[in-house]
Amino acid sequence: MATQSSAVIDSNDATRISRSDFPADFIMGTGSSAYQIEGGARDGGRGPSIWDTFTHRRPDMIRGGTNGDVAVDSYHLYKEDVNILKNLGLDAYRFSISWSRVLPGGRLSGGVNKEGINYYNNLIDGLLANGIKPFVTLFHWDVPQALEDEYGGFLSPRIVDDFCEYAELCFWEFGDRVKHWMTLNEPWTFSVHGYATGLYAPGRGRTSPEHVNHPTVQHRCSTVAPQCICSTGNPGTEPYWVTHHLLLAHAAAVELYKNKFQRGQEGQIGISHATQWMEPWDENSASDVEAAARALDFMLGWFMEPITSGDYPKSMKKFVGSRLPKFSPEQSKMLKGSYDFVGLNYYTASYVTNASTNSSGSNNFSYNTDIHVTYETDRNGVPIGPQSGSDWLLIYPEGIRKILVYTKKTYNVPLIYVTENGVDDVKNTNLTLSEARKDSMRLKYLQDHIFNVRQAMNDGVNVKGYFAWSLLDNFEWGEGYGVRFGIIHIDYNDNFARYPKDSAVWLMNSFHKNISKLPAVKRSIREDDEEQVSSKRLRK
């Protein structure tokens, strides 16, 4: 088996990349998130989250006016999903827990939903029984609506204690079997698109002509999405306070896990960040080089610098000034080193050029304009990469290698997982089932990016695993069901029947591992097993 330092792969043929090119303990997996796949919005005692409220109150912000009420019904079809994962033969499955499914009121005093606990116990037990490691995210943007109504969710420091209470419940109920935890998924996306652009729940922010002229970097949102016309919120302050409280909640949960659970449960805990590679538009321009570095600071450094040094990046202090919150000495100490591993989610890259200073008055301050950069998709008419199904996602495989090396060198991170990486295509209802399963663009995307992950490892980055996004076609936030990210095709017209795409078959053939059943600790109320997976759903 190849070792991290010795593997040699054909630099001209990413199609031949396989498990043999990676260390024996390298983890290959795929992922999902609760709101995007579960459905069952009103089933089993689940309480509403801010995404339930947002999609119902502002259907104009979602393509087709759709929502995640049913999603792809994994709440009821999770056994099929486990069987699909078994057939794929990968090592791990990354999923998130719906905070309001286990705590409908957001905290213990509002009651623990035993049906929600049982659902996740059954999912975890099913994964382990088939040799699949669960990687669990605690927060994937779905704040319980009860806490949003009570004090504004992550706008308030009160969220820190409630998040810790929720995390402790999860550690206690599931930590005997879950050995890899992530506190937060893409807190950047939650802060910026929830509180600056207003495109995501809870839909706070403000759009002015200046913000339109200097848009934020596109990540998981279309440039042709509806402009947020709400008047609530302050995009020049709220994203920074929300991030401040996210970071404090993360650090407090990590401290709790390390002090009370890690020794007995022998697990690890980390955080997953949104990333893009920022390429200077003019590599010979000092201002563009500086702008690219600043763009990385405002996206990745905003979160990485506090958990490595205990403070925000210097560039953010300079350009945001007094609107950037400050950590107390105690908070800085708690933040510094608050991770066992770091997850990076990578999809695309941008060209970056320096932008002029905001001079239109304090009323127009926004995260978008604070960065003082302009994002470009092309250089002299040549795109940075081919277009995918979404206008924000241009394919640039070299970027994943560059961002991994950058993260290692800049923050000296000892252990990294690629926790999301994938590409979408447009949902085309005119395709036959056979045609819809031929996803050549995704297949090439995965091959090229996994190849570049291996190259980053050769560069000295300790990458311990890779998770393709996503297992299933699903509810893709502002895009609704208009695009497909899954390696498994969902037939929305046939009770969410699941069919493997070519990319899934390639992953199975290239990264299948001979797995043995691992004993699952069955602490849950088991469901009846009479419901069998239909052969139709699993035919290849």
From Swiss-Prot:
Disulfide bonds join C221-C230. It comes from the Eukaryota. Changing E476 to A/L: Loss of activity. Gene3D superfamilies: Glycosidases (3.20.20.80). The active site is at E186 (proton donor), E420 (nucleophile). The record marks S390 as: Directs the conformation of W-392. Keywords: Alkaloid metabolism, Disulfide bond, Glycosidase, Hydrolase, Transferase. InterPro entries: Glyco_hydro_1 (IPR001360), Glyco_hydro_1_N_CS (IPR033132), Glycoside_hydrolase_SF (IPR017853). Changing H193A: Reduced activity. One of its GO terms (molecular function) is vomilenine glucosyltransferase activity. Changing E186 to D/Q: Loss of activity. Its EC number is 3.2.1.125, 2.4.1.219. A beta-D-glucoside binds at Q36, H140, N185, E186, Y347, E420, W469, E476, W477, F485. The record marks W392 as: Controls the gate shape and acceptance of substrates. It catalyses: raucaffricine + H2O = vomilenine + D-glucose; vomilenine + UDP-alpha-D-glucose = raucaffricine + UDP + H(+). The keyword RNA-binding does not apply. PROSITE patterns: GLYCOSYL_HYDROL_F1_2. One of its GO terms (biological process) is alkaloid biosynthetic process. The keyword Hydrolase applies. Belongs to the glycosyl hydrolase 1 family. Glucosidase specifically involved in alkaloid biosynthesis leading to the accumulation of several alkaloids, including ajmaline, an important plant-derived pharmaceutical used in the treatment of heart disorders. This is Raucaffricine-O-beta-D-glucosidase. It comes from Rauvolfia serpentina.
